[in-house]
Amino acid sequence: MELFKHTLFINLDHRTDRLAHATAEFEKMGIVAERVKAVQPKNGAIGCTMSHIKCLELAKLREYEQVFICEDDITFLTPDLFTRNLAQFVGNEDLRWDVLIIGGNNVPPYQQLHEYCARVFSCQTTT
């Protein structure tokens, strides 16, 4: 199963350790990913947000219908569960979605739609 047609991951130039980590994680999952050079202003949180926007702009420019955007510290803890849940989500034509968040802290209230997904109105991440 091809998990994602297009995958972009954000990485700072000097974080070669994280580049190696992300590369190993993608290989483990069979994902072909493209590195995007992170934006690095003085404020790291702003740089992270700007880097995500950079990825979205790149995806729009390339006319990607869907894109998986992640950071270089991504870890797939349970690859089989992730693959199974993603396949169920993508295969469910009744689900309408614009953004799929695969990791974060969901803030109530949210709707548990299925065992493998919830409709979230607020999700906290580091940015």
Feature-to-residue mapping (PLM):
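An acidic/histidine-cluster motif and surrounding catalytic segment
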Residues: 1-70, 74-127
